[in-house]
Amino acid sequence: INDNLEAMAKQLYDYWFVQFDFPNEEGKPYKSSGGAMVWNERLKREIPIGWQVENLKDFAEIKNGATPSTTDEANYGGDIVWITPKDLSDQQSKFVYQGERNITKQGFNSCSTSMLPTNSVLMSSRAPIGLISIAKHEVCTNQGFKSFIPKDMNDSIYLYYYIKHHIKQIEQLGTGTTFKEVSRDDLCKFPILVIGAKDAYKQWIVLQDEIANKQFVLTKEIAALTKQRDELLPLLMNGQ
């Protein structure tokens, strides 16, 4: 069910904001109905007339993460959710709300990680580049992330799909010899399309929120069932 919902959500993004067939004022698909387009040099493509292209840093605040010292046990086991790329890799989910290890207030204060509000967009920026998730809880991350706090939190789903759609270009920004990493400076300058059709955009957000809410409920149910299974299996194996 979750995969079907995700296919719908992605299709909605592609159809409206990649092909530009969002509903015009008459409810007809904009570009297919002859909506005016103009060439944009930064994106190297046509976009609807009146739409803008900004730097990512003007659309969202971009935050780094960090790791508290692992030699001090007092830094770990608290109630602050701390996310690593491994968490995203293991969970394979559009949403993240818990990690393998929490950190304490002391751990948080001891390093340069940042607290990210609910609906921030997390993107792994090295080893590998491009795991993406939306935070459904206040979280912080290790240094394997660049995270985005949209200036308007209603933009988080659009930002999630925009980054996902452009992940190949973002990967190409990676530098480094041991493993490639995308720098905050390069992401700050990355272009983002700002939607000009405000009524259509509001409509799109309502549709996406509806899908996302269903997906998140299912994600939590699956996580609870998986936990239950993992606890019961050893007991069954031992004949209990």
Show the residue positions of the predicted features.
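Non-catalytic DNA-recognition/assembly elements of restriction-modification systems
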Residues: 1-16, 32-67, 189, 198-240
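Short, surface-exposed recognition loops and adjoining beta-strand edges that mediate ligand/DNA contacts
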Residues: 17, 23, 27-31
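Extended non-membrane alpha-helical scaffolds
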Residues: 21, 49-56, 61, 71-73, ...
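Low-complexity, Lys/Gly-biased intrinsically disordered segments
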Residues: 25-28, 44, 49-94, 107-111, ...
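A short beta-sheet element
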Residues: 84-86, 100-166, 173-175, 183-185
